[in-house]
């Protein structure tokens, strides 16, 4: 049967389109990486609330409507990395508030160790929520360093959770990612274990300690 060039062109286009429609979803399914069960699990996407462990949650800035949920989760302490007063949304809820305003683009090792220690201390009293404004950059940084220093994850595993865990766009976590990539993991773990303020002997916190000791000498 004779077909015109236009008919052959239509058949070719139909074949290409069919292959695309059949192969596209299959290819996407093959290339989409499954979400690790070890990553923080979603609790309330409206405030980017995730459960990292039975005693540690992370989120964006909550609101007054979040209080009932946090009470059901038995959160005892809220740790904030922004300047806003958490009492504005917590009201009179029986939750301890810890304010630790930070900047992900200029955080240092001493600040990270201080936050990790305060998180651990608060966890001993019950579940803790840490948050910043959007729940990805500052919160992502401290969540990743908690995974690495406290829980023993390696950098790559913590970075994968940070960037692919559903907390926000990867571009919004550039500062956090940069700190994690450059972190002296062994030094931070050793300083954490030894109760030191920083892995660097020349850190400002150590200089302050030396000055205080010098002033205390008779």
UniProtKB/Swiss-Prot annotation:
The gene is tpbA. GO terms for cellular component: periplasmic space. Phosphatase that regulates diverse phenotypes in P.aeruginosa via regulation of the concentration of cellular c-di-GMP. Acts by dephosphorylating the membrane-anchored diguanylate cyclase TpbB at tyrosine and serine/threonine sites, leading to inactivation of TpbB and reduced c-di-GMP production. The reduced cellular c-di-GMP concentration leads to reduced adhesin expression, reduced extracellular polysaccharide (EPS) production, pellicule production, cell aggregation and biofilm formation, and enhanced swimming and swarming. It affects colony morphology and controls rugose colony formation. This is Dual specificity protein phosphatase TpbA. The lineage of its organism: Bacteria, Pseudomonadati, Pseudomonadota, Gammaproteobacteria, Pseudomonadales. InterPro entries: Prot-tyrosine_phosphatase-like, Siw14-like, Tyr_Pase_AS, Tyr_Pase_dom. PANTHER family: DUAL SPECIFICITY PROTEIN PHOSPHATASE TPBA, TYROSINE-PROTEIN PHOSPHATASE. Gene3D superfamilies: Protein tyrosine phosphatase superfamily. Adopts a canonical dual specific tyrosine phosphatase (DUSP) fold, similar to eukaryotic DUSPs. In the absence of ligand, the protein phosphatase loop is disordered and the general acid loop adopts an open conformation, placing the catalytic aspartate, Asp-105, more than 11 angstroms away from the active site. Ligand binding reduces the conformational dynamics that occur on multiple timescales in the loops at the active site.
């Amino acid at each position: 049967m004779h077909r015109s060039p236009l008919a052959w062109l239509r058949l070719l286009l139909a074949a290409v389109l069919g292959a695309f429609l059949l192969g596209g979803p299959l290819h996407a399914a093959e290339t989409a990486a499954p979400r690790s069960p070890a990553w923080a699990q979603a609790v309330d996407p409206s405030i980017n609330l995730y459960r990292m462990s039975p005693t540690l949650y992370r989120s964006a800035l909550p609101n007054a409507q979040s209080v009932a949920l946090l009470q059901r989760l038995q959160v005892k302490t809220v740790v904030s990395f922004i300047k806003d007063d958490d009492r504005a949304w917590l009201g009179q809820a029986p939750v301890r508030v810890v304010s630790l305003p930070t900047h992900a683009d200029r955080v240092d090792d001493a600040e990270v160790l201080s936050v990790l220690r305060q998180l651990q201390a608060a966890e001993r009293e019950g579940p803790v929520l840490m948050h910043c404004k959007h729940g990805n950059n500052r919160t992502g940084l401290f969540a990743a360093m908690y995974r690495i220093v406290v829980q023993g994850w390696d950098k790559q595993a913590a970075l994968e959770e940070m960037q692919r865990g559903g907390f926000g766009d990867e571009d919004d976590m550039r500062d956090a990612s940069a700190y994690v990539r450059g972190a002296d993991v062994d030094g931070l773990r050793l300083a954490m274990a030894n109760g030191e303020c920083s892995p660097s002997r020349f850190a400002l916190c150590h200089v302050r300690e030396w000055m205080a000791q010098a002033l205390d000498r008779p």
